[in-house]
Regions:
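Aromatic-rich peripheral "rim/lid" segments of glycoside hydrolase catalytic domains that contact
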Residues: 90-152
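Extracellular glycoside hydrolase catalytic/binding regions
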Residues: 1-108
Length: 152
């Protein structure tokens, strides 16, 4: 499901797909189908241990994407078919995490797509409560997210 390289396909040169939802505590905070009991702690980026040290941050994202980077070095195509954050993740946390994700995907020459363009993971009509939206032809545009996406 886009979280591990399929080793058996490597000799065949078949392109592979990765999902950029790691860690789920960021990407799926309060998403009923993942965070079923609302048990994920309030997200920060990076995610910190109780003592303030980094539990999950850019280094762990680098480790997560490294196997797909190795495929690219072998000339095997890779795309990130899904990324984004559910609309309950605080906007500033989402943007900081997404910046790291997109930077790493670019570093590995991996193309990407949002889970959805319009809706709870999207740049339009996401229904986030902590965004100052712009009107875009009758839709609510998240300009900060759009600017970040355009950077990559």
């Amino acid at each position: 499901m886009g979280t591990k390289v399929v080793e058996g396909l490597i000799p065949l040169g078949v392109p592979q797909s990765v999902h950029a939802y790691y860690p789920a505590q960021i990407s799926h905070y309060r998403a009923s189908w993942v965070d079923r009991n609302s048990s994920f702690p309030d997200p920060t980026w990076p995610i910190l241990n109780p003592d303030g040290s980094v539990k999950i941050g850019r280094k762990q994202l680098e480790d997560y994407f490294a196997p797909w980077g190795e495929l690219r070095k072998k000339g095997i195509g890779v795309h990130c078919g899904e990324t984004g954050c559910f609309n309950r993740t605080p906007h500033e946390v989402f943007l900081a995490w997404m910046e790291d994700v997109l930077d790493l995907l670019k570093m590995h020459d991996i193309g990407w797509a949002l889970w959805n363009f319009r809706g709870s993971f999207g740049v339009l009509d996401s229904d986030r409560k902590d965004v100052a939206y712009e009107d875009f032809h009758g839709h609510k545009l998240d300009r900060k997210l759009l600017n970040l996406l355009q950077k990559y």
